[in-house]
Amino acid sequence: MQSQTLLADTPLQSPYVEKQDFRDAMARLGSAVNIITTDGPAGRAGFTASAVCSVTDTPPTLLVCLNRSASVYSVFKQNQTLCVNTLAAEHESLSNLFGGKTPMELRFSAARWSTLATGSPILHGAVVSFDCQIGQIVSVGTHDIFFCQALALTRNDDSHGLAYFDRRYHSLLKQ
């Protein structure tokens, strides 16, 4: 483990760590793999994300981070709804489709989908899907943080999970 200690009288050259050092460190932060979907007046869209987490259970709220320069950004912002589909181990190839430049029609044609309360696509076989309404948007740096209230959910308790760690996929086996 590397560490660095700065003494109080040590002048800082920059208030932040280097961008690549930060990215390399974040690659060591394992997380679930999710496909975030929406459908509504602005159209249907989806992308792969690991920047998702629980905020509170009262009301049930998650956060999803999305780069404002992403091609799908305006669709999500205008629709104001989304579904967080947490992927099962067998969804690795689907994650790659939704994480690249594949046209939306091809992304969605690669799996089976349904809908719940908001009309956002729910992935069949996902470990869990949170069907949400976007309640608040906060901008930080290059990204917007969508705070999303869960209106409905589905669970698949028999699935193995899919995680991303050290820039690779890993299956999480249910015990």
From Swiss-Prot:
It is an enzyme of class 1 (oxidoreductase). GO terms for biological process: nitrogen utilization; uracil catabolic process. It comes from the Bacteria. SUPFAM superfamilies: FMN-binding split barrel (SSF50475). InterPro entries: Flavin_Rdtase-like_dom (IPR002563), NADH-dep_flavin_reductase (IPR050268), RutF (IPR019917), Split_barrel_FMN-bd (IPR012349). It catalyses: FMNH2 + NAD(+) = FMN + NADH + 2 H(+). Its EC number is 1.5.1.42. GO terms for molecular function: FMN binding; FMN reductase (NADH) activity; FMN reductase [NAD(P)H] activity; riboflavin reductase (NADPH) activity. Keywords: Flavoprotein, FMN, NAD, Oxidoreductase. NCBIfam families: RutF. Catalyzes the reduction of FMN to FMNH2 which is used to reduce pyrimidine by RutA via the Rut pathway. Belongs to the non-flavoprotein flavin reductase family. RutF subfamily. PANTHER family: FLAVIN REDUCTASE, FMN REDUCTASE (NADH) RUTF. This is FMN reductase (NADH) RutF.
